[in-house]
Amino acid sequence: MDAELPHSMIGSYLNPPERMYLPSFSQTEASQNCHPGSSPKMFNSPNNQALVSALKTLQEKIRRLELERTQAEDNLNLLSREAAQYKKALEEETNERNLAHEELTRQKKDISIQLSSAQSRCILLEKQLEYTKRMVLNVEREKNMILEQQAQLQREKEQDQMKLHAKLEKLDVLEKECLRLTTTQQTAEEKIKYLEEKLKEEEHQRRLFQDRACELQTGLEISKILMSTVSSSKLCNERKKLPKKTNCLKREPPQHTDCRFRGPASERERPPFRMTSSARAEPHSSGEPFSICDNLSELLRTMQDELDQMNMEHRELLRQIAQTGSHSDSEELEQELEHLARKMESKEDQISKLQKHQDRVRKLQEKVENSRINESSGIHGNPKRSKNLKTSPRKCLSETSAFQKDRSFQPVKVHSLPPRLRRDDVKWEQ
């Protein structure tokens, strides 16, 4: 009891002294009224008083314990509620932490993905930068090569212009030679006309001479008939006088004697004159075509030399392509090879055109030479022609006029030659 009293007075863990319950006066009276019969006896003895006080203290302790129990239950309920709230809050906090952790992991993943994409982009940008650097170097190299090619093309253009100028000068020379040929042809035609007129005059004089010879022949025959009737003595005298008479007859008409000597003289002088005219015409007819052919053949040889030079350059480029190792150099050499191949094709076309033109010029010259040979053979050395001149002068005139038409037809071809050659030259240079 003594041990309980100080403990009850001190208090406990569940019921500290400040929270100790002090019973009220009514409660003490009720407790006293519960035992009315024994109160006088109990209060009379000291033990009873101590017992009562102990009971009172015990009752108070029980009450306190009940109160503490109720308080403990309340506290337990409160703690359970607080624990539930704390657990709920903790769960919410853990959920929030999980969500935050998931968000953080997601952000980390996004950041890692972005970082990897940025790294890949940086690598790609570095590759692009290296590629652009190489492209810039290639462009600068190509620019330098293009400038060199332009300079080379400019030099080639100047050389082509010089060649074109030389070809144009050759064409001017050819045109001058062609004009000279036409002038010589015109002079030859004029000489032919003069010779035809002279032939007409000689034909007329020959006819007069033949008529006079026929008259003399008839006179001689008449004199022979008259002389046959005379005696032999007189016939001898007449025969002696006959040459005198014939000489007198020959001396009397000076026109007949002139015609007699003029005819053979003209016949003797005519072939040399024709030979001289033909000799004058032959150098022009032979020399000028040969000069044209020589110029064309020289031009063809120069173009063949250029084509051979291009072939050598083509082989050299093929050798360089086979020896080179870099792709860019091989592409540049292939481009140069294609350009050279196009130039070679154009040069071959030019050579073929020039050969065709040379063949046409040669055929034209052969036609002109054949016509001139036919003309010279028809005028000079054809005996049938001379017989036809004696028998049918009109036929001779018609043949000469026909030949003159052929001669007038030839200069058209000769005149049409230089402009066609000039056009072909312009095509060759293109």
UniProtKB/Swiss-Prot annotation:
Primary site of residence: cytoplasm
Coiled coil start-end: 46-213, 290-377
Biased composition (Basic and acidic residues): 249-272, 362-372, 421-430
Keyword Phosphoprotein: yes
Protein location: Cytoplasm, Cytoskeleton, Microtubule organizing center, Centrosome
Single GO MF annotation: identical protein binding
Domain of life of the native organism: Eukaryota
Gene3D superfamilies: 1.20.58.90
One protein family per Pfam: Cep57_CLD
GO terms under cellular component: centrosome; cytoplasm; microtubule
InterPro entries (UniProt xref): Centrosomal_MT-associated, Cep57_CLD, Cep57_MT-bd_dom
Modification type Phosphoserine: residues: 45
Entry keywords, A to Z: Coiled coil, Cytoplasm, Cytoskeleton, Microtubule, Phosphoprotein
Region ranges (Disordered): 248-290, 362-430
Function: Centrosomal protein which may be required for microtubule attachment to centrosomes.
Family statement drawn from the similarity comment of this UniProt entry: Belongs to the translokin family.
UniProt-recorded name of the protein: Centrosomal protein CEP57L1
Organism: Rattus norvegicus
Organism lineage: Eukaryota, Metazoa, Chordata, Craniata, Vertebrata
Gene behind this protein: Cep57l1
